[in-house]
């Protein structure tokens, strides 16, 4: 199983790039069933600490299906969302589910082409 980060995820954290080791930890936790919300269609919401604890950290939208790869699709800093308002709108959620379905259907050749085109990058985790 490979772990990939899509370009929108990295772009949203351009100034506060999240270290790959934190992405690996978040991926391991999600695979172990530790996540904030299952949003359906293989889409999950996961908190990632940015140094000041998880409550003030980042939120990742992750596509994962058992026996498939894991994709960090999008993300945002918790501080950018207003409290009391739904963080992910229904139309965004439907789009994430569609994207997840397309990602799960990718062939190895399509994955390589996406990496070469810099649409996503692979994260290498130790152990």
Task: Show which residues each predicted segment covers.
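Generic alpha-helix signal with a bias toward terminal, lower-confidence helices
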Residues: 15-16, 21, 25, 30, ...
């Amino acid at each position: 199983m490979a772990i990939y980060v899509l370009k929108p995820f990295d772009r949203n954290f351009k100034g506060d790039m999240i270290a790959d080791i934190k992405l690996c930890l978040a991926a391991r936790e999600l695979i172990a069933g530790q996540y904030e919300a299952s949003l359906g269609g293989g889409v999950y919401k996961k908190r990632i600490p940015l140094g000041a604890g998880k409550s003030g950290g980042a939120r990742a939208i992750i596509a994962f299906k058992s026996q498939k790869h894991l994709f960090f699709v999008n993300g945002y800093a918790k501080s950018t969302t207003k409290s009391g308002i739904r963080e992910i709108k229904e139309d965004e959620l439907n789009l994430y589910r569609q994207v997840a379905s397309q990602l799960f259907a990718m062939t190895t050749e399509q994955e390589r082409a996406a990496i070469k085109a810099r649409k996503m990058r692979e994260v290498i985790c130790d152990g």
